[in-house]
């Protein structure tokens, strides 16, 4: 008997449980129709965990994740918990500790504009007529967000604050290797984003990326300063394949790429460590304003599951089938509210049913 692949499911808050229910439909098909040996266990996280147990990341949840091969995450947070100190709120007290505990140093954020949804993009039609497919590879555990010293103080000149951008060569090497490896199965292009005309950390970044690139002669490497990159993405997004970014630059660029697709409800993400253990989640938030209305778009959650199948289970063919099922649903004209004309749209559960049907029929 094949060893079961263990998935910890953390639905979370807001629309998290609603869109996770649609991902469960896909998981059930993978078990029954594709004969994947899966062991799925669900745990509480975020605000709902605070309400139940007084903490956003309960010990049982952390241990459950430790005993799993991957984490499928929903969303956390909401105004209900804004009274708490920032460090105790659902977002800060669950996601960040999980990333740190499992050393999830890389964040993968695909931004794809489907040809049938070109009208959603805020960019002109002549810019997006061919669509685009960008993968932002962001270093997640180093850089200015974690560098020390940082703080706030006063002197004779007044009050001041400071942060420190620190990158070690090994941190740059491992994220660069991942970007090149991912590019080799895409269009074989990596564009590294830095600010090496100003920042010492970016000078090292560019040097290390150039060094790593010598191991991948089939990959075309280019470099852009962060300010120029932001402009080029607006001007011609289809020129890009894989974007390799430091923590802060990746934070900026990935959100820009997300917005020009027209709907963040379509976008998945993955955070991986060196052993391909990953946390997979939609790029959007918990959207408490539409919680319980059955109008949330479940596609980002379903595509996050597809990324789990691809990167942690290494089952590219099955992941391709899930992606294709999503595309076929869109091609057939099915739309949730966020990607519709506001009049003709289907509910959250209906979109999940339709994608599941395409997956079964396309097996």
From Swiss-Prot:
One of its GO terms (molecular function) is NAD binding. GO terms for biological process: L-leucine biosynthetic process. The record marks 145, 195 as: Important for catalysis. InterPro entries: IsoCit/isopropylmalate_DH_CS, IsoPropMal-DH-like_dom, Isopropylmalate_DH. GO terms for cellular component: cytosol. It is found in: Cytoplasm. Binds 1 Mg(2+) or Mn(2+) ion per subunit. Pathway: Amino-acid biosynthesis; L-leucine biosynthesis; L-leucine from 3-methyl-2-oxobutanoate: step 3/4. The keyword Amino-acid biosynthesis applies. The keyword Metal-binding applies. Its EC number is 1.1.1.85. NCBIfam families: leuB (TIGR00169). Belongs to the isocitrate and isopropylmalate dehydrogenases family. LeuB type 1 subfamily. Catalyzes the oxidation of 3-carboxy-2-hydroxy-4-methylpentanoate (3-isopropylmalate) to 3-carboxy-4-methyl-2-oxopentanoate. The product decarboxylates to 4-methyl-2 oxopentanoate. This is 3-isopropylmalate dehydrogenase. It comes from Buchnera aphidicola subsp. Rhopalosiphum padi.
